[in-house]
């Protein structure tokens, strides 16, 4: 039994012998308490706390904690398997600036197969979720405020509070998780990284690889790939893959890529003010629309929405198209949403953008150019945010022989399949599984991908190639 599983067993025994059933269920679904908490003011101490939000109905014990570090605190949740047979699993959420603790229900309802044999550790990485200080930017809530002005206001507020905006980087986040592992008394664990969380996982392999038994990299972002430079071709590949599917299914007789090119070409010359559900008018140019299309296609339901939305836009019904895309796109903003915009900016502006071409090349293809113009907008925001560039090592390729499962979907416009293939070629003990029907982060939404992850963490090694379940 793993160290963390041993602690869980002790807690279960004490709870069942000392607590009434009602209190036992409360402990199991929210925060479990112990009497030997370290001093909350001590650096690198882990203390218990109530779980945030509503309790999630489950038979499993779920405990929540706060890891106190020298820069602030991290929110942590542990989902305790009833009878763990393998090492614990650290889940690394995407973003940057995402969250995991408030989204623990995604593991519990329905219960993930991983929890049949493994405890799962969830952590809100620095700057996001319930971790402190938060780099969330509620200033972005007002759609009438230009993004640059909103980011400037957020920066000013954080600076007035003494928050170090440059503290959220790949390197610092990975170092936090080494402290978390030690604080939990874990000698070795599995990693499950999703999207940008895969980059944190790769950094953990670099700095703490002897403590990693295996890694699952779902929709990976390899450090050596210049993400912004490569993304236009990746978005086009995902859209072309979707067009191939919808033509085969006879759901887009008019095509997808051609009509979208025409729409984007018009918006590049003449942005359109669209009235959104709140009644506010919002301007859409080609860069903003392609980002919304990509966000929608990346979502689990995107395959069923994007082709219809493009058809609506091609008919001149842009507002209806945008409303349909917004229904499925993951475009959360500030308080209570899944994304801390400041944490995302800090990491992107320090870890990624400086290593990309400062002057994106326009090709004349409306899709490629719309994506490239999005990078120009991010650079403008980084100029406002102003954080230092990370050391060059953050951009070096990772080499490891740790057993690794890589998952990639051909419909993923956020982390294209080409990146996964490149990473698989470099890692010495990796299996790459692809699917033409997966989009972004399939292990969190697709039953086949989730099953492959659970089997891999239990020691089974799937065959490389297309998913066979």
Residue ranges and their predicted role:
Residues 2-19:
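Bacterial N-terminal signal peptides that target proteins for export
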Residues 31-33:
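Bacterial signal peptide processing site
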Residues 36-287, 346-348, 352-469:
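Gly/Pro-rich cap/lid or specificity-loop segments adjacent to the active site
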Residues 221-239, 308-311, 318-332:
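Flexible "cap/lid" loop of the alpha/beta hydrolase fold
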Residues 272-291, 297-302, 334-342:
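Structural motif
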Residues 295-311, 315, 354-359:
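Short helix-capping/linker segments at secondary-structure and domain boundaries
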Residues 319-352, 357:
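Long, low-complexity segments enriched in small/aliphatic residues
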């Amino acid at each position: 039994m793993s160290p963390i599983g041993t602690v869980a067993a002790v807690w279960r025994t004490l709870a069942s012998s000392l607590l009434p059933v009602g209190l036992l269920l409360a402990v199991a679904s929210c925060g479990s308490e112990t009497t030997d908490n370290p001093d909350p003011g001590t650096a690198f101490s882990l203390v218990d706390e109530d779980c945030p939000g509503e309790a999630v109905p489950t038979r499993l014990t779920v405990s929540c904690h706060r890891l106190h570090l020298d820069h602030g605190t991290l929110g942590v949740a542990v989902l305790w398997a009833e009878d763990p047979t393998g090492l614990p699993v650290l889940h690394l959420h995407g973003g940057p600036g995402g969250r995991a603790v408030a989204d623990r229900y995604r593991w519990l309802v329905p219960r993930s197969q991983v929890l049949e044999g493994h405890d799962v550790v969830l952590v809100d990485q620095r700057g996001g979720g319930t971790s402190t200080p938060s780099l969330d930017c509620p200033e972005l809530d007002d759609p009438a405020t230009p993004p640059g002005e909103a980011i400037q206001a957020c920066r000013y507020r954080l600076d007035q509070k003494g928050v170090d905006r440059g503290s959220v980087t790949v390197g610092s986040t990975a170092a936090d998780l080494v402290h978390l592992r030690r604080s939990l008394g874990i000698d070795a664990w599995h990693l499950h990284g999703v999207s940008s969380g895969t980059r944190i996982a790769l950094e953990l392999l670099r700095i703490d690889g002897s403590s990693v038994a295996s890694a699952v990299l779902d929709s990976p972002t390899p450090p050596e790939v210049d993400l912004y430079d490569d993304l236009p071709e990746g978005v086009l590949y995902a859209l072309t893959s979707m067009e191939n599917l919808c033509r085969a299914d006879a759901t887009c007789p008019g095509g997808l890529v051609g009509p979208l090119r025409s729409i984007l070409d018009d918006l590049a010359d003449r942005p359109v003010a669209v009235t959104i559900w709140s009644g506010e008018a919002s301007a859409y140019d080609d860069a903003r629309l392609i980002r919304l299309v990509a966000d929608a296609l990346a979502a689990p339901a995107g395959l069923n929405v994007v082709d219809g939305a493009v058809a609506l836009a091609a008919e001149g019904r842009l507002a209806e198209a945008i409303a349909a895309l917004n229904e499925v796109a993951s475009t959360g903003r500030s308080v209570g949403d899944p994304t801390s915009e400041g944490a995302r900016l800090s990491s992107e502006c320090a870890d990624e953008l400086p290593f990309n071409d400062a002057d994106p090349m326009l090709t004349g293809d409306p899709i490629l150019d719309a994506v490239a113009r999005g990078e120009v907008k991010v650079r403008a925001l980084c100029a406002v945010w102003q954080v230092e560039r990370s050391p060059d090592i953050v951009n070096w390729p990772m080499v490891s022989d740790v057993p690794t499962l890589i998952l990639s979907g051909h419909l993923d416009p956020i982390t294209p399949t080409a990146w996964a293939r490149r990473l698989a070629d470099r890692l010495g003990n990796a299996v790459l599984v692809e699917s033409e029907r997966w989009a972004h982060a399939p292990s969190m939404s697709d039953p086949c991908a989730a099953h492959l992850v659970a089997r891999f963490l239990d020691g089974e090694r799937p065959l490389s190639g297309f998913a066979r379940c």
